[in-house]
């Protein structure tokens, strides 16, 4: 949602895919990159790249002008605001916050994983590319 909306605002979007050591991801970084590439294949101004390390290092290496973060709720803001301050201090990057659309404000990967693990239907919660991978896991 946020990436698609950003594609109308910015001339070029670079989506960085990284492993967050504090989260247990269902899919590998490569699988997540592949799904994102499939989801955005028709968007000429969106490029997906995976990386390791700090976001500011990735952004610097790729001449990124600003970091965009999607926010679902105030709890997201608390964490992302701290990260934005750190990114500004470390490398001078500006962070732009964009709220998710209301229909996605409650949604999280943890919620999708839990619903799916109990056999619930997540068709309306994820893109078809993600649903296909979920059903093959």
Regions found by a protein language model. Give the residues of each.
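Nucleotidyltransferase catalytic core that binds NTPs
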Residues: 1-137
């Amino acid at each position: 949602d946020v990436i698609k909306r950003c594609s109308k605002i910015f001339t070029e979007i670079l989506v960085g895919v990284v492993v967050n050591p504090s989260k247990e991801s269902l899919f590998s970084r490569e699988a997540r990159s592949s799904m994102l590439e499939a989801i955005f294949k028709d968007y000429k101004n969106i490029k997906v790249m995976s990386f390791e390390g700090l976001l500011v290092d990735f952004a610097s290496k790729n001449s990124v002008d600003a970091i965009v973060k999607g926010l679902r709720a105030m709890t997201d803001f608390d964490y992302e605001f701290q990260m934005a301050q750190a990114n500004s201090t470390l490398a001078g990057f500006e962070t732009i916050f964009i709220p998710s659309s209301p229909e996605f404000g409650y949604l999280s990967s943890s919620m999708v994983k839990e619903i799916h693990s109990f056999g619930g239907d997540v068709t309306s919660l994820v893109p078809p590319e993600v649903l296909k991978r979920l059903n093959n896991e």
